[in-house]
């Protein structure tokens, strides 16, 4: 059973997606009618999940009685569900190891995944894992107390990566890269040790955008954090279920839930972090142009290799003309030729003809399914 099943209720819908022979992962290939049918199924599946979630929340405390909170939780649950479905993140029988740092993102991820586990018609297990990196002043009792109070199965790993990072990173350089590599290596090994099939990280949409611009501005590469990643040794699968979620929604959700947040003193003690500068830029854009970040994130899912300059992604060398034998004249009023002798020397016409509108070519183009677009030069987003 795949991730798509996670969002298909165990009821017989009026419309069966499988009966239409089109690719559900590429909605731009569908007709308007087909898309309406898909949207109808997705809406009814979401409604089913909403009903299950409402039943669960009916017995909870006053916090969930807030209409605003429940709307926000529904929004996050749907966005996480869509990300899991779109990238086939969680399948039946998976053991999902949720990495919990004590920050707002990982708390929110764990909370939403636990809700989905209760209402999904497939079975998957969740285990929370925290890596205590022995940073000075780290309140090591906070996370275990919270996880025990919530009845969440968990492991607390202790490894002094802090001392290693401090010893190998030169003074004045940022710790983030070295810290991340050490942490990732430890979590990879432990996931394999306990048999976890997926490692869930709390990176959200804005993290992915910030990483995109960090690589663009400082790494000379068009790349970001993928929603799903197979490790280089093919031993572990990373997933980012918050890929569609905005940070401001996570902040609000975390505040409403009153998670016991643990700040990262190692990161917070550093100044002039490039990621912090990028995050400030993104926030300014979002304030001034509310749809800009959504447009950029959409662009990350709509890559056109032929319109870039990466020779590995697109074969520019073997591009060749494929013209027909029909002579097509310039449709205009006049053509003025200059340096006629030079034109003649290279075999070009010295007095090319013009023509008025040619209905034959117009009729031929009507059969083309390619949309007619007005060319845009240097569009401003």
Curated annotation (Swiss-Prot):
Motif (PP-loop motif): 101-106
NCBIfam families assigned: PRK10696.1 (NF007972)
Gene Ontology BP annotations: tRNA thio-modification
GO cellular component terms, A-Z: cytoplasm
Family to which this protein belongs: Belongs to the TtcA family.
Other facts: The thiolation reaction likely consists of two steps: a first activation step by ATP to form an adenylated intermediate of the target base of tRNA, and a second nucleophilic substitution step of the sulfur (S) atom supplied by the hydrosulfide attached to the Fe-S cluster.
Lineage: Bacteria, Pseudomonadati, Pseudomonadota, Gammaproteobacteria, Moraxellales
Official protein name in the record: tRNA-cytidine(32) 2-sulfurtransferase
CDD domains: TtcA-like (cd24138)
Catalytic activity: cytidine(32) in tRNA + S-sulfanyl-L-cysteinyl-[cysteine desulfurase] + AH2 + ATP = 2-thiocytidine(32) in tRNA + L-cysteinyl-[cysteine desulfurase] + A + AMP + diphosphate + H(+)
EC number: 2.8.1.-
Entry's Gene Ontology molecular function annotations: 4 iron, 4 sulfur cluster binding; ATP binding; magnesium ion binding; sulfurtransferase activity; tRNA binding
């Amino acid at each position: 059973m795949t991730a798509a099943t996670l969002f298909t209720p165990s009821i017989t819908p009026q419309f069966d997606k499988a009966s239409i022979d089109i690719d559900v992962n590429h909605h731009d290939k569908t007709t308007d009618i087909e898309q309406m049918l898909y949207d109808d199924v997705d809406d009814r599946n979401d409604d089913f999940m909403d009903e299950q979630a409402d039943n669960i929340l009916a017995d909870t405390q006053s916090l969930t009685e807030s209409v605003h909170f429940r709307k926000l939780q529904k929004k996050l649950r749907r966005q996480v569900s869509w990300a899991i479905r779109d990238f086939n993140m969680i399948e039946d029988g998976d053991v999902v190891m949720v990495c919990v740092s004590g920050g707002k993102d990982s708390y929110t991820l764990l909370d939403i995944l636990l809700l989905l586990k209760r209402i999904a018609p497939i079975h998957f297990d969740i285990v929370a894992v925290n890596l205590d990196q022995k940073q000075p002043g780290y309140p090591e009792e906070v996370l275990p107390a919270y996880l025990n109070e919530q009845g969440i199965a968990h492991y607390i790993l202790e490894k002094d990566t802090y001392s290693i990072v401090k010893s190998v990173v030169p003074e004045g350089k940022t710790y983030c890269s070295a810290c991340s590599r050490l942490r990732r290596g430890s979590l990879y090994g432990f996931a394999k040790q306990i048999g976890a099939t997926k490692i869930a990280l709390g990176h959200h949409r804005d993290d992915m955008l910030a990483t995109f611009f960090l690589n663009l501005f400082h790494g000379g590469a068009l790349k970001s954090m993928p929603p799903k990643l197979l490790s280089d040794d093919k031993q572990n699968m990373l997933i980012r279920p918050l890929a569609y979620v905005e940070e401001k929604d996570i902040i609000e959700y975390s505040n409403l839930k009153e998670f016991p947040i643990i700040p990262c003193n190692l990161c917070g003690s550093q100044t002039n972090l490039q990621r912090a500068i990028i995050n400030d830029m993104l926030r300014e854009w979002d304030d001034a142009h509310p749809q800009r970040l959504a447009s950029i994130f959409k662009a990350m899912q709509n890559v056109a290799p032929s319109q870039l300059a990466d020779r590995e992604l697109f074969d520019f060398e073997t591009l060749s003309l494929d013209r027909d034998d029909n002579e097509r004249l310039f449709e205009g009023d006049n053509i003025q030729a200059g340096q006629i002798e030079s034109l003649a020397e290279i075999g070009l016409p010295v007095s090319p003809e013009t023509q008025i509108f040619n209905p034959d070519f117009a009729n031929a183009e009507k059969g083309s399914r390619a949309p007619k677009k007005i060319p845009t030069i240097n569009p401003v987003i």
